[in-house]
């Protein structure tokens, strides 16, 4: 019986020859994507196994939904500086509309303002402060890839011009000529006007919250950035398999900005990831009899050959990280990873959440990368992370908790594939109308007295909340850059981030210790004003040093605006 398989090639240059060979061998196309290395074909399982042997082919996989993998929101529920001055909320049951999210003071503040071992759960719930943020994100395009974002939320209004910054871009009408073509079965990608929603019709909240942290005027970082949105999570979403095709076409074909003389940088946030959710079938968790075997670092463990701590859930959680209540597993999709790599190569900046499964994420070169569990739900790799967050080149963000010490959040994935940690617990941001929201959060939300009308806010947790902290900071770094790729973002973030201040291994240090490090970087997001408060600029270059007129031989670094060549 024929099924639909996604065939991913190693090289884009091989596509035309591959198309011709597949056609001559009688394979029908389900979906041809000329901008992508991925093509969807009808074939049998036996043909799929045989096709993998073609040296041009990287992967042949069933579509992710047919493997039990679905995209999930990852929430648990010219420098123009500005100041963030007021109360920063980090923990507690009380929050006000005038509170700022604590990511601002954590990321832009100094050691005193961060208040380690004093500010947060176990210490003071709020902190009054004043931090300077060095830029506002003007002339940068941020794209929020998430569930629906309300077009009319007041958080998207420019503080400088009082104009709405949300761009209702017509993705299908403008870009379908670059993205898709009619295939053997007549299938096409969506057409017509893009299905935007406003506060009165937005049944979701996650996209609003993420957007608020990236670019909100009160809760966010890039307060003057242009805001774009692609829905990847709702019933009317853009097909995930075409998401990065649209992002690449958008980036390549956007007009020249007449103010800067160049195309705006494209900085994208992905607070979602593929995974398998078994909580519906096992609402109270797994029983040890549900687990058949675990292959860990090449050794097979089971009831007859248990690990050091025994074949029971306390034991296998300590030894391998497989817990009775871990009913969600991250999943990788080779076709999505290939699209991500191509988008990064084109210059699209991709920042993504590490995911909320509390699993160790290994690098492909690590022995742990090939660990898998066989259970009642099938066989799953559990140390590879999620697509797109763990794909090569993506800036993968883990979540810091709101404890007064600076530990990772207990839900956050961790390990060497995480690039940087950022605040992701009790993050206050924009919200949707509680009377319209459906699902578990129906009726939940707080009216935003700053704006009145149909505007709301609420604090939630997740790596979904950590990733937009990094995305927002990246948008600030992007302003006035002649080129701005993922490698540039990574270098800039790493050059400023704080090393060694996070607390790991506060318990036993094994996988059952939810503060375990296991190869995680001790690196948390940080930015600082790149210029001293006095002195004159070197007029020879916008990327040059800062000079103090009283000390003409002394140059101050401008780390936030350093240009890194390819």
Residue ranges and their predicted role:
Residues 14, 232-391, 451-468, 556, ...:
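Substrate-binding/access-modulating region of protease and related hydrolase catalytic domains
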Residues 9-11, 63-65, 144-148, 213-217, ...:
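Active-site-proximal beta-strand/loop segments in catalytic clefts of secreted hydrolases
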Residues 53-140, 151-157, 523-529, 536-537, ...:
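Protease zymogen maturation seam
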Residues 211-215, 223, 228-235, 407, ...:
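Hydrolase catalytic cores
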Residues 229, 244-245, 255-282, 394-396, ...:
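C-terminal subdomain of the subtilisin-like protease fold in secreted/lumenal serine endopeptidases
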Residues 120, 132, 244, 352-394, ...:
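Active-site-adjacent substrate-recognition loops and nearby beta-strands
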Residues 95, 99-100, 113-245, 255-267, ...:
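Subtilisin-like serine protease catalytic core
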Residues 13-105, 356, 384, 391-393, ...:
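Autoinhibitory propeptides
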């Amino acid at each position: 019986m024929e099924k639909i398989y996604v065939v991913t090639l190693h090289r884009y240059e091989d596509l035309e020859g591959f198309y011709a060979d597949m056609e001559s061998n009688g394979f029908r196309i389900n979906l041809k994507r000329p901008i992508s290395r991925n093509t969807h074909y009808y074939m049998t399982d036996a043909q799929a196994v045989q096709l993998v042997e073609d040296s041009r082919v990287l992967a042949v996989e069933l579509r992710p939904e047919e493997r039990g993998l679905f995209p999930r929101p990852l929430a648990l529920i010219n420098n123009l500086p500005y100041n963030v001055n007021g109360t920063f909320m980090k923990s507690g049951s009380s929050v006000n509309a005038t509170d700022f999210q604590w990511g601002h003071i954590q990321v832009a503040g100094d050691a005193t303002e961060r208040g380690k071992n004093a500010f947060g759960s176990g210490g003071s719930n709020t902190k009054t402060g004043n931090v300077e943020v060095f830029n506002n994100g003007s002339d940068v395009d941020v794209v929020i890839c998430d569930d629906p974002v309300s077009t009319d939320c007041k958080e998207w209004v420019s503080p400088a011009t009082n104009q709405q910054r949300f761009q209702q871009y017509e993705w299908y009408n403008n870009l379908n000529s670059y993205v898709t073509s009619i295939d053997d079965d007549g299938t096409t990608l969506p057409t017509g006007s893009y299905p935007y929603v406003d506060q009165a019709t937005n049944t979701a909240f996650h996209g609003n919250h993420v957007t608020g942290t990236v670019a909100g005027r009160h809760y966010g970082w890039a307060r003057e950035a242009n805001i774009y949105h692609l829905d990847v999570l709702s019933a009317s979403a853009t097909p995930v398999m075409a998401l990065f095709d649209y992002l690449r076409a958008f980036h390549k074909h956007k007009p020249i900005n007449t103010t800067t003389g160049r195309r705006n940088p494209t900085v994208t946030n992905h607070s979602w990831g593929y995974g398998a959710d078994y909580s519906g079938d096992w609402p109270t968790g797994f029983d040890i009899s549900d687990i058949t075997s675990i292959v860990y670092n090449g050794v097979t463990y089971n009831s007859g050959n248990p690990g050091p701590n025994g074949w029971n859930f306390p034991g296998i959680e300590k030894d391998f990280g497989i817990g009775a209540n871990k009913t969600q597993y991250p999943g990788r999709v080779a076709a999505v990873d290939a699209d991500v790599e191509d988008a990064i190569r084109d210059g699209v900046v991709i920042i993504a959440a590490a995911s909320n499964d509390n699993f160790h994420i290994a690098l492909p070169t690590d022995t742990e990368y090939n660990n898998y569990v066989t259970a009642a739900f099938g066989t799953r790799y559990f140390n590879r992370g999620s697509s797109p967050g763990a794909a090569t080149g993506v800036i993968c963000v883990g979540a810091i908790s709101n404890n007064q010490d600076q530990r990772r959040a207990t839900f956050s994935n961790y390990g060497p594939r995480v690039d940087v940690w950022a605040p992701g617990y009790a993050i206050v941001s924009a919200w949707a109308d509680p009377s319209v929201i459906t699902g578990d959060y129906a009726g939940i939300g707080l009216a935003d007295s700053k704006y009145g009308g149909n505007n709301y806010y609420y604090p939630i947790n997740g790596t979904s909340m950590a990733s937009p902290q990094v995305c927002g900071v990246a948008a600030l770094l992007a302003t006035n850059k002649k080129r701005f790729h993922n490698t540039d973002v990574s270098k800039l973030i790493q050059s400023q981030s704080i090393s060694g201040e996070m607390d790991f291994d506060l318990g036993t240090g094994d996988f059952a210790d939810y503060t375990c490090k296991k190869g995680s970087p001790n690196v948390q997001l940080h930015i600082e004003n790149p210029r001293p408060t006095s002195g004159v600029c070197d007029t020879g270059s916008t990327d040059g040093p800062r000079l103090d007129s009283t000390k003409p031989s002394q140059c101050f670094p401008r780390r936030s605006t350093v240009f890194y060549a390819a």
